[in-house]
């Protein structure tokens, strides 16, 4: 069993990183439950966390607050740990409409979902890695606190095969069917097996290219080989192979029988209550739906929406904590919460939203009350899994502050860059003043970010600046991911000099060319002008040696004062460090291709945008088809190379091209 983390990097910890790594490692060794790494923008927090993982050598769960960020972290950790198991566990739905009922209009919305096969494969790869080795890092979104099948059941139902093992061919086939593998001799894909005489080929649920060939001689396994599923090329012999279930909700036959009896009993009790309350229509609906599901479970071993019966399948009492990915980890694992000021409130809010929707379904006869137990964890249940947890944020939230009296700071950037200087100027005449500042930046070939409070103000300001000949663009929430990347790219290339937006805090806006961030109406207290938002926004100018922030305000609010003082404190510390070590701040030199680290498709996508999209209208049907086919091929190649962000970019672009065509 491989159990050591091996960090591969041409860099050594620099600046503040060595002391941060040392303190974090010491905290874990001393058994500290909560620690917070308060790292300023651009100080290399991911590298610090990678060093921590290497030193403490524990299986690690890294939680991010959205798929894009999770994908970005996955790419980074994969680079740092190429010889260890770096896995990706996010929701496998490309599109998900949960089942819901609107009583006012008597409208039932069926569950509708499009499952991403690639992500499903990665989820299986993540859970199977946890049972096979200890050097595992799983990058997950909040989907890791949602219900999953029992880890004990999942582990017990693994089919373990070795050469010279005595097992009848038909018994192996039965075992594979029990763990949700389907026999398919024609369309051989993930989660299926095929039989050719004495040879059984199994396509594991956690793979997408290699399958396992088991060769029998009578009732004995003669040889086990790993084979390329597409070409049939033999890749090598195996001494042992473990086939993990094709579903996380697998149940042994005897448990399934017991679960069916329990579901029937709950159904009878529920129908009795409904009849007593005169809910005849709801009772009929519930009976019809549940009996159909039970029939499917008896005959097939599963049914659509089987997760709603997960409490019965795992034989847990009502109200008990569901199994989640966290239960698949060994007891001594470590949790890292990235951008914790956003992620922790997200984890906290999941349970209530889920219960509100399901309660309506239960009340109107679409589900049994036990469906309420198929849910995300309550926050206090999540807390029980915290043995060693590290929160990572430039602006920790109240929960982290409360639980970690002493913050571990990482303020010094390896590049020597300082936090920007801040000017506060009056609101009167702010636009004329801003135009003067923009002109000065344009002359030096630098860029400007402007953040406003309302959509209308953003639009009006954009129009006004365009009228006076400034190259400006406007970033708002309705812009698709693809266009967003293109706008940021154009800003870096100099097609625009100014970018205006309301919320410029979203990931991917760390642009080295930006030397000025202007905050309009900085004294209007609220979500976008809170101390946290202000510090994060100020950080956008910290990638440039000339970085400066101008706040337009008539009074200095409490949030402004905290943000200004914190930035000043950090800057003084950084200047002191640079002076002692003789460092001259250097603007980060980042390839334009790398606009958003999570989406390395920017380069290729730009090519398609310029070559394919404008000419699409003039193309013949055949030519258009050729472009689409080429992109589909590239998308699959990217997915195969585990470059999911690029694959997602190409997929979105494909959809746009198909819609236009």
Curated annotation (Swiss-Prot):
Motif Beta-hairpin, residue range(s) on this chain: 92-115
Domain Helicase C-terminal: 430-596
GO biological process: nucleotide-excision repair; SOS response
Family per similarity comment: Belongs to the UvrB family.
Assembly and binders: Forms a heterotetramer with UvrA during the search for lesions. Interacts with UvrC in an incision complex.
CDD domains in alphabetical order: DEXHc_UvrB, SF2_C_UvrB
Localization annotation: Cytoplasm
Residue ranges of domain Helicase ATP-binding in the record: 26-181
Function summary: The UvrABC repair system catalyzes the recognition and processing of DNA lesions. A damage recognition complex composed of 2 UvrA and 2 UvrB subunits scans DNA for abnormalities. Upon binding of the UvrA(2)B(2) complex to a putative damaged site, the DNA wraps around one UvrB monomer. DNA wrap is dependent on ATP binding by UvrB and probably causes local melting of the DNA helix, facilitating insertion of UvrB beta-hairpin between the DNA strands. Then UvrB probes one DNA strand for the presence of a lesion.
Organism, as annotated: Bacillus velezensis (strain DSM 23117 / BGSC 10A6 / LMG 26770 / FZB42)
Keyword terms of this UniProt record: ATP-binding, Cytoplasm, DNA damage, DNA excision, DNA repair, Excision nuclease, Helicase, Hydrolase, Nucleotide-binding, SOS response
MF terms in GO: ATP binding; ATP hydrolysis activity; DNA binding; excinuclease ABC activity; helicase activity
Pfam family, one: ResIII
Free-text note on domains in this protein's UniProt record: The beta-hairpin motif is involved in DNA binding.
Name this polypeptide is given: UvrABC system protein B
